[in-house]
Regions:
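Short secondary-structure boundary/capping segments
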Residues: 7-9, 31-32, 54-55, 82-83, ...
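Non-catalytic C-terminal accessory region of glycerolipid acyltransferases
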Residues: 74-184
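Generic beta-structure capping elements
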Residues: 6, 20, 33, 44, ...
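A broad, low-specificity signal marking well-ordered, structured residues that form hydrophobic/aromatic
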Residues: 1, 39, 146-148
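Membrane-anchoring hydrophobic helices of lipid-metabolizing enzymes
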Residues: 1-15
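Catalytic core of membrane glycerolipid acyltransferases/transacylases, capturing the structured
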Residues: 11-70
Length: 184
């Protein structure tokens, strides 16, 4: 894997980590690569029922979210905000809410950014590319290059003072511009 911009992570403290979502491998790869930041990802509750994978993400302290129940989803957002304020852990989310099969950025669910706003923590904006090829390349015994780019860290003061919808549009714009630059 290649990591670009790791120096853009906050020098200290925890944060909300956001990324585009291309593959089921994304959270495990990002959790492994950035293990020292103790990122607990939010994942759809159905993933916790997948044999072996569900056990793995549970052990990695991932948090289930019920995407079909807004009240329960907000409980997960509040739990994640408490995790940021009460522990040294960071939280990771995919604001698109699902994998993009076309490798294009899907519309954001801006509510997940409330995790950082409620906790008063910075947001680390990133992109991941290449994970969509892992399964196909494994079957052909080919190496897959995965690139993770840290685009920007939005400081906590700006996170708290900006409307959630504006923050969402800004983050989506950063990610979309980066992903479009990388298209062949």
């Amino acid at each position: 894997y290649n990591i670009v911009g790791e120096e853009k992570f906050p020098a200290e403290g925890n944060f909300l980590f956001i990324s585009n979502h291309r593959s089921n491998y994304d959270p495990i790869i990002q959790w492994t690569v950035f293990k020292r930041y103790k990122i607990s990802f939010i994942s759809k509750k159905e993933n916790f029922r997948i044999p072996m994978y569900g056990r793995l993400i549970h052990r990695c302290c991932f948090m289930p979210i019920d995407r079909k129940n807004p009240r329960k989803a907000m409980e997960t957002v509040n739990r994640a905000a408490r995790l940021l304020t009460e522990t040294g852990n960071s939280v990771g989310v995919y604001p698109e809410g699902k994998r993009s099969k076309e490798c294009r950025l899907l519309p954001f669910h801006s509510g997940v950014l409330k995790v950082a706003q409620k906790a008063g923590r910075p947001i680390v904006v990133s992109t991941i590319e290449g994970t969509e090829n892992i399964f196909r390349n494994i079957r052909r015994f080919r190496k897959t290059v995965v690139t993770i780019k840290i685009l920007e860290t939005i400081d906590a003061d700006r996170v708290k003072s900006t409307k959630t919808s504006e923050l969402s549009d800004y983050c989506a714009g950063l990610m979309k511009n980066e992903l479009e630059e990388q298209e062949p």
